Amino acid sequence: MPLAQIPAAAYGPGPRSPRPDPSCRRQGERHFDVIVYGDEPAGVMTALELSRQLPRLAGLPRPRIALLTPSDLRAGLGGTIARSGLAYLDRNQVPRDMWAVLPPFAPSSDLYRRFLRLTGVQQIAVDPRQASRAFRRALARARITLLAGVEPTGTELERAAAADGGTLQGEGSDRLCVIETAGHGRLGADLFIDASLGADLAHRASVPFLRGLGPRGLSRESISLGWIFEVEGLSITQLRNLEEQLTRRLLDRRDREAQHWLVGWPAYRNNRQRLLADLVDQRGNPLLLYSATSDSADQQSPALSIAVHGEQGLAPGLRRAPARMDAANVAILPDRLSFNALLFRNSAAQNREVIARHGRPLGWMVPAAADVESFFLRHGARRVHWMPELYIRSADQIAHPRMALSAGLMARGGVPRPEALGTFSYHLDFRGGISAYVPPAKPTFNFGYRHTLPREVSNLAVLGPASGFGGLGQGAGRIIELNISVGQGLAIASALALARRLPLAAVDPREVARLMPAGFAPYGRPSGSTAFSLFLGRLLYQLESWFPRWPWEPGWHSPLAS
C-alpha cells in the first residue's frame, strides 16, 4: 500500500535510538512532554493536535501537554480572535484555475478544517465569544493543562553536546529546559513551542531576532495596528443605507458640510472624476457594502471613511495622521457587527511596546476610538464595544530559521513539494503600513514547518508572525490559517522527535509531509506561471488522490501492487 496509507502505529517509537538522550538534566518542578506558550489560535490548535499525535507517533498514551499564557483569560481564550476580536477571517484564496477541483476557500490543512468546525465558522465570520468557549471545552476534553497569568522571569538552558563529544544531527548549541515563572514555579519540558505573538519565550532563551520587517531600512517598519470594535443596533441593510446617504451628500455640491469633509482629501477635492470613480459604479449607483458570503461584507467605497474623518476634522492617511478609518471588513455575527477598520500608525519599536503590554491600547489611541464611537452612535447604533486588546499584525522574526519562508520563496512557489505540508494563497498584505511602497503580490505557495525552527535552540519552535519569514514574508505569515496549518506539521514533527529522541531539526520534513492527512495535496506554483503549467499543476493535484506519492519520490509504492 502507499506509504501515506500505512497505519500511524507503524511510525511509532520503535527501538530506542542509539543516539544520546537529548532531554535535559534539569526537569523543573513540573515537567511536561511539550509546553506550548501562548494562547493564539495556532497555539491552541497545535496543542490539540499534539494530544492526537503523541499517542499515535510517540507511544505516549497520556501525553503531558501544557498550554501557558501570560494573559488574563477572563477576557477570553484565543488571543487575536478572543481578545483582539478578529472575527473576519482571512481565508486561503484558491486560484481561479483550481476551482474545478477545490472550492474558493478550501482549507489549507485538516487542522484548519477542524478549527472551522470547532468554532462554528460557516464561511468567514467567527464569533470571538463562541470561539473562546469552544477552545476551553476542547482543551479540557484533551486533558491539556491550561495555566493563565504565566509571566516568564527567566529560562534555563543546557549545552546540547553529545556524550561522545559531538553534537546531535540538526541540533543547535543549546536546548531549553525550564521556564522560570512568577507564581507557577519552574516549568520544564522536552519540547517547547512558542506560539505567542512576540515570541517572548524565544527572546528569553536568547534566540536572535530580525527587527521590524527586515534588514537595513525595513528594520524600523511594522504593519499598522488595529483596534476592532463591535456595533450593536445596526444591520447590514441599515449600514448600506447610511453609505448611500453619505455618498449622495458627497456628490451634492450644495451640501456645504459634506463638501467641507473633502478638505482633508485633496486627491478627491481637486479631482471630481476620481471621486466619482471611487464612490459610484459605471451606472452611477453608489458603491455599497458587498457581501461575497452570507456572514461577511466588505466596503467598496471610502464614503464612510471620509465622513468619519470629516466630521471630526481629522486628516486621513497614516502618513499625515496617527489614525485612519480604513475600508472595513465586516463580520456579521448573530447579534452584532464586527468592524476591522480602525488603523493606527506603527513602528517596530512601538509594536514591541504594545506586545510587551499584552496588546493593551496606548493612551493616544483612545480619542480616535471615541470619535469613531460617537459617529456610529449618531447614525443609529445602540452600542459600540471596543475589544480589550489591539489587533497586532506583525512582530520581530527569528533571524536564523532552518529554512526561511520568505516573500521570495513564496513567489517561487514555496518549499519543495516533497516537504510541503500544504498550499496557501493570499495577498502579501501590509495594511496601512508600507503598502504604498511594496508592489502588490498574491503568491500561491507550498509551506512547511522548518521556518519555525531557530538554529540556536534545538528543542524550540516559534509559531506565528515571529517565525522565520525573512522580513516581508510576514505579509502572509501573519494569517491565522497559515499558522494553524503549519502547526499541524509541527505537531507531527514534535511527536517523531520525542519518539526517536531527536532534536526537531533532525526530523526528516519529507516524512512529516507524508504523515499529513490526505486531501490537502500541495499545488504551489511560481508567480506568473503560464497557462500550460497551471493546467499541468491542476492535473497533478487530481492525480494525487490516486497516487499519494510519486514514483520518483523515495519510498514510493504503487497502489496497483497493494
Where do the PLM segments sit?
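Flavin (FAD/FMN)-binding glycine-rich loop and adjacent Rossmann-like elements that form
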Residues: 12-18, 80, 185-191, 196-519, ...
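Second-shell loop/turn segments in exported
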Residues: 31-36, 99, 118-126, 188, ...
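N-terminal Rossmann-like FAD-binding beta1-loop-alpha1 element of flavoenzymes
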Residues: 34-63
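Soluble non-cytosolic domains of exported or imported proteins
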Residues: 40-41, 125-130, 477, 481, ...
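Mobile, glycine-rich extracellular loop/lid and propeptide segments
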Residues: 41, 45, 151-153, 191, ...
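Stable alpha-helical elements in mature extracytoplasmic
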Residues: 42-43, 131-135, 197, 201, ...
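Conserved beta-strand-loop-beta-strand element in the redox core of flavoprotein oxidoreductases
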Residues: 156-186
